[in-house]
Amino acid sequence: NRINKPHRQDLYDRLSSLTCGNISLQSAGHELKYPGLDFVTYDRHYDNLSNLLSIKRNFQTSMFSLVTESQYEERFGIITEKTLNAIVAGHPFIVAGHQGCLDDIKGLGFKTYPTIFNEEYQYFENDERIDAMLDLNGAYFTRITTTALHDLVDEHRDIIDYNRDYFFDSFGPDRLEWLRTQLLNIWE
């Protein structure tokens, strides 16, 4: 997360009191190189590939991702590289994002993890969504053992593999076809 936003800070503050795992505001303890750049500077100087490679180890040394998406309070949000990185890394994920964010991820063709995470939090209003996410899911993950976490990931290997395969094999062509259809519908 390149930019600290209120929902990210709120989630960080709440998770910091827990005694599990590596809780950090910026990608598993690493401040990213270029925080808060304006678009012109970002466009000229920011290196997304270097940034992605700099957090590779974080994905390799963790079992699931709690993604803080770019949009939280917006009525209609987008799904960004943050969620897609978790998918490519083979992580089950939970997302602190806009209302209905998990439904939007499913709408893109991916699967989520309702047998791991209680996903009802996504329907709560902005000021209640993070509370609901933590209330519905937090206690379990503060008590789970490393062995049980490995077993949980193994039990969901079919979804992990589906998401990764879908991302590499179909996601781009599906999005391109969707865009073509939208453009044709506009000009009919």
Regions found by a protein language model. Name each.
Residues 1-67, 73-188:
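Pol beta-like nucleotidyltransferase catalytic core
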